[in-house]
Amino acid sequence: MKALLLDFGSVISKSLFERHELIEEKLNLSKGTLTWKGPFAPETDPLWMAMQRDEITERAYWGTRAREIGALVGEQNWSMTDLLQAIGGERIYDKVLRPQALKTIAICKQNGLKVGILSNEIELFTGKEWVENLPFINDLDSFYDATHSDILKPDPRAYQIALEQLNVLPNEVLFVDDQLRNIFGAIKCGLKTLHFDITEPDACFDYVRSVMGIELGI
């Protein structure tokens, strides 16, 4: 493998399911107010299951959750950007980004491997300033965010853009994403893939490092 290509939301950043306590704390909501748990407890989250069946988009899912949370604090029509800024924005990178992801990115770079991001909506959800100040942004060899484009995963063109930015062949890349539809899209384009399980981040990044031929501490 010559390059690691990562989705951002839920892969590099912790999912909002994992941030329920932080959201409740920052917004002064009672503990346990947020009951939808996505893949951690699918039976609690019919909307999540609808997304998994491709009945709604990921953007629609999170847009709904943002509006619901906004309504709990008396705000109407909150977007994901509104929500994330309300709980701390760029001030809480250490609570939002997965340490396993940051370590893996750093070790890849130390070993001369390329690292890129292929996302559908980083800036849409977090805001431009938040993206520009990501602590690892200058370590990336490629960055494609479809916030300002109509070319979204799993459109084959999205993967092709990332491959061109990385200047590698499809079989030289490991692509990691938490959404199965995006994994299928990558497979069709010839990329090696890992369907990221957000309930097992340690195991997933252990696998990533194994495939990339690197280890912690190198």
Predicted regions and their residues:
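Active-site neighborhood of HAD-like aspartate-dependent phosphohydrolases
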Residues: M1-E43, K188-C189, E200-A203
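Asp-based, Mg2+/Mn2+-dependent phosphohydrolase catalytic module
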Residues: M1-L6, L118, I122-E123, G127-I218
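Alpha-helical elements of Rossmann-like donor-binding domains used by nucleotide-donor carbohydrate transfer enzymes
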Residues: E18-L22, P46, A60, T64, ...
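Hydrophobic alpha-helical core bundles mediating ligand binding, dimerization, or RNAP-core interactions
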Residues: H20-I23, Y61-A66, I87-R91, F125-W130
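Short, surface-exposed acidic
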Residues: L27-F40, G70-A86, I214-I218
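A short acidic, helix-capping loop that chelates divalent metal ions and anchors anionic groups
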Residues: D45-M49, F125-K128
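A metal-dependent, Asp-based hydrolase signature
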Residues: W48-L84
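Short, acidic loop-to-helix structural element flanking the phosphoryl-transfer center
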Residues: V73-G116, P156
